[in-house]
Amino acid sequence: MALEEQDLEKADQYFYKALEQDSSEVLYELATYLEGIGFYPQAKEIYLKIVEDFPEVHLNLAAIASEDGQIEEAFAYLEEIQADSDWYVSALALKADLYQLEGLSDVAREKLLEALNYSDDPLLIFGLAELDSELENYQEAIQGYAQLDNRLIYEQTGISTYQRIGFAYAQLGKFEVATEFLEKALELEYDDHTAYELASLYFDQEEYQKAVLYFKQIDTISPDFEGYEYGYSQALHKEHQLEEALRIAKQGLEKNPFETRLLLVASQFSYELHDASSAENYLLIAKEDAEDTEEILLRLATIYLEQERYEDILDLQSEEPENLLTKWMIARSYQEMDDLDTAYEHYRELAGDLKDNPEFLEHYIYLLRELGHFEEAKINAHDYLKLVPDDIQMQELFETL
């Protein structure tokens, strides 16, 4: 055939010859073939020629118009198919698809409900359940999926109804039932998204061992699955497998070197493994692209304070941190560097917000005493002792003020 030989000029000649000479039946077969291989203009021309003999090709014309983005034209073709036609249910189903494409899911649902008045086709029930799930009508979606034969629907669509029911129950907060259906779906056919949903659900229920099991399945079977490493590393951390958690986080960073969440957990795990240098490096990389740097600045300040790197803490002021604890570490840095007046200014700004923090008050009190602000120191010592009444050293200091 000319098309198979990629001789388009010869194919064009055959096409117009067929239009002039071939019967409607032969043209119908040719049009469906052309439509199937993406030659929509030629298929459309034939369908328009034979539409009187085969009114069902209004469906094909509507589908082609939809492919071309001509939605109004597609609807116009579908309106030609009346309720007494054998193709009316198909027209309603295609209308539902078009309305969904237009973002009118409620109207699409109405069309499928109308179609179900004429037919109990499982694919219509499935389509309605899919729409209900999209519209967050999860209970209705579950009822729809439950009517269907899972194996039959999977063969026709590649989608497991058990999986869909599990997802819907998860959205309803019924996690125990959700995991039952998702596990059943996974037993019948492995699916990355199902395994990920199961792992995430078990993590949220603090069943970390089971979460690790399903994350490991993904890691073994589908290591290219996007984004599982963050949850997997967190689950391993909860199971006290710290070195393995860091390894998985690093594995994720090989795919996405600037993924903020992974950089933060890699920093955390490095810090817990007493590798402060790596912890700092991960934070510095994260700081470059993160939309919100507050947590990053707090962690950096914490590392610098432990290492008595007060100048580095003061340099963080250029980032204009808003976190109160980061600001307090800046105040403490001035205090440790004997710039007491500047430290005092920072402490005063923070005092109202951190008045219930005993450690803050303790440092503030000693700063006030050193600056000779004895009355203010006594007031704060009184507040401190309300929070920590058994601090003998502070009681003695209070009595001397």
Where is each model-derived feature located?
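Start-of-helix register in tetratricopeptide repeats
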Residues: 25-27, 56-59, 89-90, 123-124, ...
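Canonical positions in the second alpha-helix
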Residues: 17-18, 49-50, 80-81, 114-115, ...
